[in-house]
Swiss-Prot record:
SUPFAM superfamilies in UniProt: P-loop containing nucleoside triphosphate hydrolases, Signal peptide-binding domain
Protein name: Signal recognition particle protein
Reaction(s) this enzyme catalyzes, per UniProt: GTP + H2O = GDP + phosphate + H(+)
Cellular localisation: Cytoplasm
GO CC annotations, alphabetized: signal recognition particle
Protein keywords: Cytoplasm, GTP-binding, Hydrolase, Nucleotide-binding, Ribonucleoprotein, RNA-binding, Signal recognition particle
Length: 449
């Protein structure tokens, strides 16, 4: 989401660091460049003014001008101020479950903001914390909206309130309250109707629902792709409904990122979650320090490790590790690794969490990061026989031609996959013979550069 902002800030930082001793004039110039970078990323003007003022005040201090590395000191100040801009207390960012069950959450937002998907993601997250969750759709206006929530709920074995055709939102709420008590649900998530724009009728209905439901959380889902409009939306909802927190959706999109840096500052309400993609596991707890590090191209290794841990099958990983110790790595293992990368959002998503990824992204062919490449490779491997996957060396020219036809691709693409497999196989075999303590010193990190 912050690709352009990250790249622009990285260029500014490179100038600062290479300058050595900094004058006040150079600091002023850097602040102007940062201001332009933030404006181009759709950050709200009041946010920019206060942010620049805070950074400049600290950057012009004698301890910075006289420090051994003034450029690095200013980057540190910017990092700290960005954390302050985004951060809320830990108690505020945590979901409020401190109420007698059933605990009610009210999801609000504009139509198309990703509210229904976010509701389902939140339900899955709570179910994985051993909570009994009921999903309730109150959107009786958008065609098939209730069915959409039911399908998403069913896909992850979460209960949704049965649909009664023609029922009004307030009547659905009353039925949900009764069902939650009878079936002893821990949490009920109400997915309210959205509109293409904010209107009086929408707000009045949401307010009436809120009075009946008495939610412990009223969560506004904001589409990160909407830029400056996100600030107007957040302000309006907060003014009318007194929201308790924010969920930023579509953070994996090609947006400028200004919404994330503005909505918390304007509403004074915490960002609780970041949502990406359609996969229901892709909901991450918001952490200001991690996001600030990602924006400033310092990487987010913690999120990388957490995401990997959540999608990797431990039993399969142990089997692969055991095979590697014996110097074995076949195309079944390669396919498993590709699928894990796909679940993590593809190569681009992984790279974005690594330090210095902004510069790397500039230097590589973006088409090579396309998740479709993984799907094509998957199709090629699945067109092979079990014997071929286990013994890739037997795949001769005629077999390659047959595999290409089966996968609907070219022999050249099959050759590329087999070449990549061979390279990775050689690396894996070398890694399996290494002492874990020597892995970092061996330059294994260069595989990602």
């Amino acid at each position: 989401m912050f690709k352009t902002l990250t790249q622009n800030l990285t260029k500014i930082f490179d100038k600062l660091v290479s300058s050595g001793i900094l004058t006040e004039a150079q600091i002023d110039a850097a602040m102007r460049d940062i201001r332009v970078a933030l404006l181009e990323s759709d950050v709200a003007l009041p946010v920019i003014k206060d942010f620049i003022a805070e950074v400049k005040q600290k950057a012009l201090g004698q301890e910075v001008i006289k420090s051994v590395s003034p450029g690095q000191m200013i980057i540190k100040i910017i990092h700290e101020e960005m954390i302050n801009l985004l951060a809320s207390s830990k108690s505020e960012t945590k979901l409020n479950l401190n109420s007698k069950p059933p605990v009610n959450f009210l999801m609000v937002g504009l139509q198309g903001s990703g509210k229904t998907t976010a509701s389902s993601k939140l339900a899955l997250r709570l179910r994985n914390q051993n909570k009994k969750v009921l999903l309730v759709s109150l959107d009786t206006y958008r065609p098939a909206a209730q069915e959409q929530l039911a399908i998403l709920a069913n896909s992850v074995q979460i209960n949704s309130l049965p649909i009664v055709q023609g029922e009004k939102p307030l009547d659905i709420v009353k039925r949900a309250i009764a069902e939650a008590k009878i079936s002893a649900y821990d949490v009920v998530i109400y997915d309210t109707a959205g509109r293409t724009q904010i209107d009086k009728a929408m707000m009045e209905e949401a307010l009436a629902i809120k009075k009946i439901v008495e939610p412990t959380e009223t969560l506004l889902v904001i589409d990160s792709m909407t830029g400056q409009d996100a600030v107007v939306t957040a302000s309006s909802f907060n003014e009318k409904l007194a929201i308790s927190g924010l969920i930023l959706s579509r953070i994996d999109g090609d947006s400028k990122g200004g919404a994330a840096l503005s909505v918390k500052y304007i509403t004074k309400k915490p960002i609780k979650f970041l949502s990406s993609g359609e996969n229901l596991i892709d909901l991450e707890e918001f952490d200001a320090e991690r996001l600030a590090s990602r924006i400033l191209d310092m990487g987010d290794i913690i999120s990388f490790v957490e995401k990997a841990a959540s999608i990797v099958d431990r039993e399969e990983a142990e089997k692969t590790a055991a095979k590697l110790k014996k110097g074995k790595f076949d195309l079944n293992d390669y396919l498993q690794q590709m699928r894990s990368i796909k679940k993590m959002g593809g190569f681009g998503s992984i790279l974005s969490m690594l330090p210095g990824s902004g510069k790397i992204m500039d230097q590589i062919d973006q088409s090579k990061l396309n998740s479709k490449i993984i799907e094509h490779q998957e199709a090629i491997i699945l067109s092979m026989t079990p014997k071929e996957r286990k013994n890739p060396d037997i795949i001769n020219a005629s077999r390659r031609k047959r595999i290409a036809v089966g996968a609907g691709t070219t022999v050249q693409k099959v050759n590329i996959l087999l070449k990549q497999y061979k390279q990775i196989s050689e690396i894996m075999k070398k890694v399996s013979k290494m002492n874990p303590k020597n892995l970092l010193r061996s330059g294994i990190g260069k595989l990602f550069s």
